Amino acid sequence: VLSPADKTNVKSTWDKIGGHAGEYGGEALERTFASFPTTKTYFPHFDLSHGSAQVKAHGKKVADALTNAVAHMDDLPGALSALSDLHAYKLRVDPVNFKLLSHCLLVTLACHHPAEFTPAVHASLDKFFSAVSTVLTSKYR
Protein backbone atom coordinates (compact mmCIF):
# COMPACT_ATOMS: atom_id res chain seq x y z
CA VAL A 1 0.00 0.00 0.00
CA LEU A 2 1.32 3.39 -0.97
CA SER A 3 1.61 5.81 1.92
CA PRO A 4 0.89 9.52 1.49
CA ALA A 5 4.67 10.09 1.42
CA ASP A 6 5.06 7.45 -1.31
CA LYS A 7 2.36 9.10 -3.41
CA THR A 8 4.03 12.48 -3.00
CA ASN A 9 7.42 11.03 -3.99
CA VAL A 10 5.99 9.30 -7.05
CA LYS A 11 4.05 12.35 -8.22
CA SER A 12 6.95 14.75 -7.73
CA THR A 13 9.37 12.40 -9.49
CA TRP A 14 6.98 11.88 -12.39
CA ASP A 15 6.52 15.65 -12.65
CA LYS A 16 10.31 16.07 -12.91
CA ILE A 17 10.44 13.47 -15.67
CA GLY A 18 7.97 15.56 -17.61
CA GLY A 19 8.32 15.30 -21.36
CA HIS A 20 11.04 12.67 -21.08
CA ALA A 21 8.68 9.90 -19.94
CA GLY A 22 8.37 8.41 -23.43
CA GLU A 23 12.12 8.55 -23.98
CA TYR A 24 12.78 6.89 -20.62
CA GLY A 25 10.12 4.28 -21.31
CA GLY A 26 11.84 3.33 -24.56
CA GLU A 27 15.22 3.24 -22.87
CA ALA A 28 13.89 1.06 -20.05
CA LEU A 29 12.26 -1.33 -22.53
CA GLU A 30 15.50 -1.57 -24.53
CA ARG A 31 17.38 -2.17 -21.26
CA THR A 32 14.89 -4.93 -20.40
CA PHE A 33 15.44 -6.67 -23.73
CA ALA A 34 19.23 -6.42 -23.36
CA SER A 35 19.33 -7.57 -19.74
CA PHE A 36 16.60 -10.21 -19.91
CA PRO A 37 16.61 -11.66 -23.46
CA THR A 38 13.63 -13.95 -22.82
CA THR A 39 11.43 -10.84 -22.74
CA LYS A 40 12.02 -10.46 -26.48
CA THR A 41 9.76 -13.45 -27.20
CA TYR A 42 6.67 -11.25 -26.91
CA PHE A 43 7.92 -8.96 -29.67
CA PRO A 44 8.89 -11.21 -32.61
CA HIS A 45 7.49 -8.65 -35.04
CA PHE A 46 9.62 -5.78 -33.64
CA ASP A 47 12.99 -4.50 -34.75
CA LEU A 48 14.74 -4.87 -31.39
CA SER A 49 18.01 -3.23 -32.40
CA HIS A 50 19.43 -0.30 -30.43
CA GLY A 51 17.43 2.85 -31.11
CA SER A 52 14.57 0.98 -32.81
CA ALA A 53 11.57 3.19 -33.56
CA GLN A 54 9.25 0.31 -32.62
CA VAL A 55 10.86 -0.12 -29.20
CA LYS A 56 10.74 3.64 -28.62
CA ALA A 57 7.06 3.74 -29.62
CA HIS A 58 6.17 0.87 -27.30
CA GLY A 59 8.22 2.45 -24.54
CA LYS A 60 6.14 5.59 -24.96
CA LYS A 61 2.98 3.47 -24.55
CA VAL A 62 4.42 2.07 -21.32
CA ALA A 63 5.27 5.57 -20.11
CA ASP A 64 1.83 6.87 -21.04
CA ALA A 65 0.20 4.03 -19.09
CA LEU A 66 2.39 4.85 -16.09
CA THR A 67 1.52 8.54 -16.40
CA ASN A 68 -2.14 7.52 -16.28
CA ALA A 69 -1.43 5.33 -13.26
CA VAL A 70 0.32 8.20 -11.47
CA ALA A 71 -2.72 10.38 -12.11
CA HIS A 72 -5.01 7.68 -10.69
CA MET A 73 -2.93 6.26 -7.84
CA ASP A 74 -6.00 5.96 -5.65
CA ASP A 75 -7.72 3.71 -8.22
CA LEU A 76 -5.04 1.71 -10.00
CA PRO A 77 -7.39 -1.22 -10.72
CA GLY A 78 -9.84 1.09 -12.48
CA ALA A 79 -7.14 3.01 -14.32
CA LEU A 80 -5.36 -0.13 -15.53
CA SER A 81 -8.27 -2.54 -16.05
CA ALA A 82 -8.13 -2.52 -19.85
CA LEU A 83 -4.34 -3.01 -19.85
CA SER A 84 -4.69 -5.84 -17.36
CA ASP A 85 -7.21 -7.55 -19.64
CA LEU A 86 -4.98 -7.06 -22.68
CA HIS A 87 -1.85 -8.49 -21.05
CA ALA A 88 -3.62 -11.39 -19.32
CA TYR A 89 -6.10 -12.56 -21.92
CA LYS A 90 -4.77 -11.50 -25.30
CA LEU A 91 -1.00 -11.10 -25.00
CA ARG A 92 -0.55 -13.63 -22.19
CA VAL A 93 2.59 -11.95 -20.92
CA ASP A 94 4.41 -13.86 -18.20
CA PRO A 95 3.83 -11.86 -15.00
CA VAL A 96 7.53 -11.93 -14.09
CA ASN A 97 8.21 -9.61 -17.02
CA PHE A 98 6.47 -6.73 -15.25
CA LYS A 99 8.98 -7.02 -12.41
CA LEU A 100 11.86 -7.09 -14.85
CA LEU A 101 10.62 -3.99 -16.65
CA SER A 102 9.99 -2.27 -13.32
CA HIS A 103 13.60 -2.90 -12.33
CA CYS A 104 14.83 -1.46 -15.62
CA LEU A 105 12.59 1.57 -15.18
CA LEU A 106 14.16 2.20 -11.77
CA VAL A 107 17.66 1.90 -13.24
CA THR A 108 16.79 4.25 -16.09
CA LEU A 109 15.31 6.87 -13.78
CA ALA A 110 18.30 6.61 -11.43
CA CYS A 111 20.70 7.13 -14.35
CA HIS A 112 18.91 10.25 -15.55
CA HIS A 113 18.06 11.78 -12.16
CA PRO A 114 20.74 10.63 -9.70
CA ALA A 115 20.39 13.62 -7.36
CA GLU A 116 16.63 13.16 -7.01
CA PHE A 117 16.85 9.38 -6.72
CA THR A 118 17.15 9.25 -2.94
CA PRO A 119 16.57 6.02 -1.00
CA ALA A 120 13.08 7.24 -0.09
CA VAL A 121 12.21 8.04 -3.71
CA HIS A 122 13.67 4.71 -4.84
CA ALA A 123 11.53 2.86 -2.29
CA SER A 124 8.39 4.81 -3.25
CA LEU A 125 8.86 4.20 -6.97
CA ASP A 126 9.57 0.53 -6.33
CA LYS A 127 6.35 0.23 -4.32
CA PHE A 128 4.43 2.09 -7.03
CA PHE A 129 5.77 -0.11 -9.85
CA SER A 130 5.01 -3.17 -7.71
CA ALA A 131 1.43 -1.96 -7.21
CA VAL A 132 1.07 -1.41 -10.96
CA SER A 133 2.50 -4.89 -11.63
CA THR A 134 0.09 -6.42 -9.12
CA VAL A 135 -2.87 -4.81 -10.88
CA LEU A 136 -1.62 -5.86 -14.32
CA THR A 137 -1.29 -9.47 -13.18
CA SER A 138 -4.52 -9.58 -11.14
CA LYS A 139 -6.55 -11.02 -14.02
CA TYR A 140 -4.20 -14.00 -14.31
CA ARG A 141 -5.74 -15.62 -11.23
Swiss-Prot record:
Globin domain: residues covered: 1-141
S-S bonds: none
Residues where heme b binds: 87
Modified residues (Phosphoserine): 3, 35, 49, 102, 124, 138
Tissue expression: Red blood cells.
Keywords in alphabetical order: Acetylation, Heme, Iron, Metal-binding, Oxygen transport, Phosphoprotein, Transport
Residues found modified as N6-succinyllysine: 7, 11, 16, 40
The name this protein goes by in its record: Hemoglobin subunit alpha-1/2
Organism annotation: Mustela putorius
